[in-house]
Amino acid sequence: HGDMTDEEMHSLYKHPKISAFMSLAHGEGFGLPIFEAVYSGIPVVATGWSGQLDYLIDEEGREQFYNVNFDLNHIQPQVVWDGVLIKESMWAYPREQSAKEKMRQCYEDVTSNNEDSYAGNADHYAEIIHERLDQDSIDTGPQR
């Protein structure tokens, strides 16, 4: 984040003009920007693949995001990177129509204040994430 403080970064996600966060990544190790959005209580539209599923799916196995469908295929030969991206690696290729549908659904949920949606539940889920990351949980391991 360069020279930005945690508070400055958080303020970007909480800016009044920001209604949601979208990531159509092929794959993420952890997905820090996605996590920061969840932690900040804004709805997320994302490819349902890779590391971000560790926190985008709650402890009961329910998705807490607008899940964009994808096709899982090998990476393109031109992006092979020795020691990082091997030719056998697989990437999620988001489906365009699914992305459009999930963006529209998120937009409609946000603008209608749909409390029964991922958008309507984003602040509550952020609270759960905060609780899971409190100092006691860090000291003693995950609470299940």
Residue ranges and their predicted role:
Residues 17-19, 41:
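A short alpha->beta transition loop at the rim of the catalytic pocket in nucleotide-sugar-dependent
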Residues 47-48, 68-70, 74-76:
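Conserved acidic donor-binding loop of glycosyltransferase catalytic domains
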